[in-house]
């Protein structure tokens, strides 16, 4: 497998497409593109048809997916607020693209358009429209009915309202649903960095009702949280007031859960009378949870740990990657541009990397597919 990436910031969409495609072909070094991922910035929304046509004419890939997004990633750069086009090309086994729709029926709803193979544990890349496709329902279905299916991707961030989204699948431009691709035979590892660090100690959930936790270790959650905060330095207490989260241990067989073992969810509310807290996930009695904080320093450290751990799991050096980073990260979180992309490139030696700023990030935690927020999710490929 060979991977090449090209990028252009030319304001003219056809010129940008031609330049990005040509650079990607050069990096592919003569390989035949089995898959193209086409990414354009939001300023190219109205020219999406021309953008796709120009890249198809230049590259003629066997399969193509992509989108228009709020900002894109190419190499070590994150292009947040400027016209840009990135083309990511990969040689290798044939890829299978698909388009999913969410259809309401008299008795409920259906996800139509593609049937995931129960026997194939191939990587699937997913790019859903946030306005017409419920990503959480698909992920719940995969976890429940098709365990072992791995999905990585990002909720497309380019549109401000229903119908604004632009999705690319082969030669079609779509405005709803989900586009994806199955990569049979691709050797990859998933990287998920949720940007948090734990505070206090892990607790067993001893009381819960759906997504409301009523007891942690026999006491109200707010009481447990107060105990933690009182033992923290003033600057740490400020983090709790601004970025408090909770982590749910995915694999309960772990004796000492660490980085990458928690599914991070936000605190949605609290009842000061009972001390109960509401979180963004249904939790069962017996689960292990730990309070977490999120800030730039924690996010930087977590990303480095996640990338280093993933690189150690690869059977060889990585040949490229696709990055889906939250549109709440970037300059908003770190105060500087290019943080996630440049950190990954520094750690992995300048691999061909592309991606976009997402409105929700998809990736597995401890083998459990999940939809995240404020996260960097990446697929790393090896030859």
UniProtKB/Swiss-Prot annotation:
Keywords: Cell membrane, Membrane, Transmembrane, Transmembrane helix. It is a multi-pass membrane protein. Pfam families: FIST, FIST_C. It comes from the Bacteria. It is found in: Cell membrane. The keyword Transmembrane helix applies. GO terms for cellular component: plasma membrane. Its main location: membrane. The chain crosses the membrane at residues 49-69, 347-367. InterPro entries: FIST_C, FIST_domain_N, UCP018953. To M.tuberculosis Rv0874c. This is Uncharacterized protein Mb0644c. It comes from Mycobacterium bovis (strain ATCC BAA-935 / AF2122/97). The lineage of its organism: Bacteria, Bacillati, Actinomycetota, Actinomycetes, Mycobacteriales.
């Amino acid at each position: 497998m060979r991977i090449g990436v090209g990028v252009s910031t030319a304001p003219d969409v056809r010129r940008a497409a031609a330049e990005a495609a040509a650079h990607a072909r050069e990096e592919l070094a003569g390989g035949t593109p089995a898959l193209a991922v086409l990414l354009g910035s939001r300023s190219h929304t109205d020219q999406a048809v021309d953008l796709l046509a120009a890249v198809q004419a230049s590259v003629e890939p066997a399969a193509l997916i992509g989108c228009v997004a709020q900002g894109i990633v190419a190499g070590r750069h994150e292009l947040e607020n400027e016209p840009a086009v990135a083309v990511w090309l990969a040689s290798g086994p044939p890829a299978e693209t698909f388009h999913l729709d969410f259809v309401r029926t008299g008795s409920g709803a259906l996800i139509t358009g593609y049937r995931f193979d129960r026997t194939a544990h191939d990587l699937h890349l997913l790019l859903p429209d946030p306005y017409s496709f419920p990503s959480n329902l698909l992920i719940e279905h995969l976890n429940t009915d098709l365990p072992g299916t791995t999905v990585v991707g990002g909720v497309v961030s380019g549109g401000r309202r229903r119908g604004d989204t632009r999705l690319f699948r082969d030669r079609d431009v779509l405005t709803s649903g989900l586009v994806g691709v199955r990569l049979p035979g691709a050797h990859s590892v998933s990287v998920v960095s949720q940007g948090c660090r734990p505070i206090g100690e892990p607790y067993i959930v001893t009381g819960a009702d759906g997504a409301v936790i009523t007891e942690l270790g026999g006491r109200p959650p707010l009481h447990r949280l107060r105990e933690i905060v009182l033992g923290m330095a003033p600057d740490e207490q400020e983090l709790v007031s601004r970025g408090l989260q909770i982590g749910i241990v995915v694999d309960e067989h772990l004796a000492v859960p660490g980085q990458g073992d928690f599914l991070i969810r936000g605190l949605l509310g609290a009842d000061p009378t009972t001390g109960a807290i509401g979180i963004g996930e249904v939790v069962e009695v017996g689960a292990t949870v730990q309070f977490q904080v999120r800030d730039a320093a924690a996010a930087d450290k977590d990303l480095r740990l996640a990338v280093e751990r993933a690189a150690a799991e690869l059977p060889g050096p990585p040949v490229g990657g696709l990055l889906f980073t939250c549109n709440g990260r970037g300059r908003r979180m770190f105060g500087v541009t290019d943080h996630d992309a440049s950190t990954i490139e520094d750690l992995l030696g300048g691999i061909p990397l592309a991606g976009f700023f997402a409105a929700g990030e998809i990736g597995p935690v401890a083998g459990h597919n999940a939809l995240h927020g404020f996260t960097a999710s990446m697929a790393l490929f090896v030859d």
